[in-house]
Amino acid sequence: MPPKKPEPKKEAAKPAAAPAPAASAAPEPLKDSAFDPKSVKIDFSADQIEEFKEAFSLFDRTPTGEMKITYGQCGDVLRALGQNPTNAEVLRVLGKPKPEEMSSKTLDFEMFLPILQHISRNKEQGTYEDFVEGLRVFDKESNGTVMGAELRHVLATLGEKMSEAEVEQLLSGQEDANGCINYEAFVKHIMSG
């Protein structure tokens, strides 16, 4: 009988607790699931906006220079402006378009600016410990190193894939004579520059 008494208390507590998390959790899914460009306050200076507009215009492929880019170009423009969003972040702020819409749907500069502001404010950067922990998975001998060839393969084929040139630039000068990379020193190097 003692186990039965806590169960009704838990059930009684759950309905009381459920409304509180539901109320506090409601805004979070809206934030993650739908990006509302109208809710973004633009904090850029006039000079910055002019610079962004100039970069945006370089990606405009419309025949009459309508200042529009395809959804597929949005991530490229953001990266050209110094941001580093993941493809998933770009898709989320675009409203999760279908693959075929990436080349057919367009957005103008006025629609792009709130996206840029949102991405620039919400940079999710990992910590030193996060990166070291992630690389430790590949440390088969538990000696603080990973094989350069394996890291090259992972960077070029998994997640946000990097080009071979990007991988080579990133790993340049990091391998020892055995082709191993001290990943703690590597992470410090990456995070310092």
From Swiss-Prot:
Coiled coil: none annotated. InterPro entries: CALM/Myosin/TropC-like, EF-hand-dom_pair, EF_hand_dom. Residues 47-84, 126-161 form the EF-hand domain. Keywords: Methylation, Motor protein, Muscle protein, Myosin, Repeat. Residues 1-13 have a biased composition (Basic and acidic residues). One of its GO terms (molecular function) is calcium ion binding. Expressed in atrial muscle and in fetal skeletal and ventricular muscle. The modification N,N-dimethylproline is found at residue 2. Residues 1-37 are annotated as: Disordered. It comes from the Eukaryota. One of its GO terms (cellular component) is myosin complex. Residues 14-28 have a biased composition (Low complexity). Regulatory light chain of myosin. Does not bind calcium. PANTHER family: MYOSIN LIGHT CHAIN 1, 3, MYOSIN LIGHT CHAIN 4. Myosin is a hexamer of 2 heavy chains and 4 light chains. This is Myosin light chain 4. The gene is Myl4.
